[in-house]
Amino acid sequence: MTNKKSQTKPLQSSKQTNGKDLHTAQTGAQVLVEHIAARGVKHLYGVPGGDCSLDIIEAAEKMGISFILTRTENAAAMMACSEAELTGTLGAVLTTRGPGVANAANGVAYASLDRVPIVFISDGYDNNQASVSHQRFDQTAMLSPVIKGALRLDDVTALPAIDGLLDLAISGRPGPVYIEVTAQCMRNTILTGCLPVRIAPSTFGPPTVEALKLAHGLVLGSQRPILVVGLQCRDKNVTKALRAFAHKLQCPVFSTYKAKGVMPEADPQLSGYFINGAAEEETFRCADLIIMFGADPVEFPPTAFKYGSTKVLEFTNAQFDRCVYQPALSVAGDLALAAMHMCECVRPSSWHAEELRKIKTHMLTRATANEGGPITPQLLVETSCHLMPADTRCTVDAGVHMLSVIAHLQSKDPYDLLISRGLATMGIALPAAIGMAMADPQRHVVAFTGDGGLMMCTAELATAVELRCNITVVVFNDSAITMIGLKQKSRQFERVGMDYGHTDFAMVGQGFGCQSFRATTPAELEAALRNAFAREGPTLVDAVLDPTAYRHQMLSLRG
């Protein structure tokens, strides 16, 4: 096994090993499945091949793990990621070698940069097949930049290393690990008692007393701090402690996109979303301390940090190789403990309630996208939010439409919205919605996607239909990759390569058996959404909109 970050932790025996007959033999496939089942895996997503995949699927079904056949390997990884994010457990993906691995690479990169623990399983060749070239390349080498570790199971003697690799996926900064299996290992047997399932606890140590004292001093010495909360705060214990800290401090709170819901939208302290852009600049110029709490560098756009002259206090559960800002102090350790300690000593800042109200109003105004029509991006989001069932969760694809969704969707808790921010990949809203629906079938999921993103994963509508997922796909249909088109225009280039031909996604959805509706006017939009939300199973609303408002919105928010 090759690990990029080795960590030594005490081991705890899982209860699943109790009562095992030491003389019972299991195949390698059964052992592998047992070990991922012990991590809470309920679904195995993928597109199988004709070799070891079959052994693993058979073992999984017998152990209560359902194999979910997807249309693409990339989407399979995205579904596994969204289920893992929502449940806090390990996600699992299975593909064949060669093209299966290559096609899954984007989804694995998403797991890496968006900090999601998944295990990616694919088959390789047995050691006695050295002469074979068909579908052969160094799969581990290809995945190496985006995985935390890898393990090749070419013999049953390698099976004891599985737990260490799975521990690696969930420890520190979560991420993907890769297991390459062979027929020799998957089909041969080993005595059950030789391989008890052992799971190392995944916890962060407390921050040092010295670091907390220094942090107390920085906060007490500031009059107008601003709190920025990031993806590491989505753990329920961290969220609870962070909210208490924020309320004690009584300062503006800005969220990253992935942390949406950590502070409820209705909270008067939640001012808006930090993107190092133009909209929040006026507020940040008034701050004498920026507290980055649980923010990950992958969440920030690749632009120079605007506030280098303002002290930055960082709280993080893991140190980073690179970051857009240089903190005056970095406090590493358990974030819930850090927030509780800070809450004990801080006092309310000098920000007034009326200032907080004005900042919140200012940020919402800057996010307005109501120019043109008849259907504008803001109208589409606001109408969807007004009509969607209570407690609906959402996903949003990469693209300019996400600006309206982030600004106007009312989230109460972490994971009410899922977005790819680290990789910022297109084509994720639909697969992520399927994964969320599989993890929690009782809550409806809305996938907000542009037409470009949907065309990258359209076939997964068939997957949603077969699984009878309670999802609604809302399509921002403007027949273009609009965000890139706006950047092209800002550089005064001729418009080339930005426009798609017209697509009727309602007809496409119907072809897959998905109940689909089309809207070109506000009245049609309301009727389509009401129809979609009233039905069981997957639905789609194809909203033909005017993209005119995007240009002003982009300039207003980002500059």
PLM features: what roles do these ranges have?
Residues 42, 85-95, 99-122, 145-195, ...:
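Structural signature of the thiamine diphosphate
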Residues 29, 37-39, 49-60, 359-431, ...:
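Active-site diphosphate/adenylate-binding microenvironment
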Residues 2-39, 149, 157-223, 343-348, ...:
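Cofactor-/ligand-binding subdomain signature composed of acidic, glycine-rich
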Residues 2-23, 180-181, 192-194, 308-402, ...:
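Phosphate/pyrophosphate-binding active-site segments
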Residues 25-109, 113-114:
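N-terminal cofactor/phosphate-binding cores enriched in small/glycine residues
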Residues 5, 121-162, 258-356, 488:
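Glycine-rich, acidic loop regions that bind phosphate or pyrophosphate groups
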Residues 129-134, 322-323, 332, 339, ...:
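Thiamine diphosphate
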Residues 72, 85, 231-315, 412-442, ...:
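Glycine-rich, anion-gripping cofactor-binding loops and their flanking helix/strand elements
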